[in-house]
Amino acid sequence: AKAASRAVFEAFSGPCQECLASPQEYASLGLENMEFGQLLCETMVLWGKNHVKLLEGSEHLSIFLKMMMAFLQHSNANVALLTIDFWMFLVRESLLGDTSDPVEKRRLLRIPDGFVGALLDVIVSKMQKPVLDTLDDSPAEYYESVKDFHEKTAALRQRLVDISRSLAKSAPEEVFRACLGN
């Protein structure tokens, strides 16, 4: 099962890296590729929630987290929202562990150094209230109306607040270090 899960990761990481290859593409999958990008994001979220522990201690974990971060940074709030459950899962697994286990027996997922700080940086940038006056403004191409845009971005900001609260509650020292830039 481990080998099969890794093979699935490798199969999907290629298209993810291709879609999100350059900084410009981190921001936009392009309208014509949006459905594919959303399906790819959903697949990676589902895979991550079930198998990310298999990547622990390898360079693949950093690659996977960077891909998920790129999806979170996407200008389409629908894509970014797809990643929220994964981030909540990752915070729980890396900072709290399985809460049904006694504290002394909990095993935490080891995430790369500096990752909490990077996640907080993205959260802060996504928390900025976006401005969209007309559907001619970017990223309006992803939304049916200005109202739809504002509703989706508000929902995203609320979910990001939830992640921030979990981080602050679970690892206040790590959050404090990240805020100080250390």
Which role does the model predict for each range below?
Residues A1-L81, F86-L109:
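Long amphipathic alpha-helical scaffold regions
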Residues K66, H74-N182:
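Alpha-helical repeat/alpha-solenoid scaffolds of the HEAT/ARM/MIF4G superfamily
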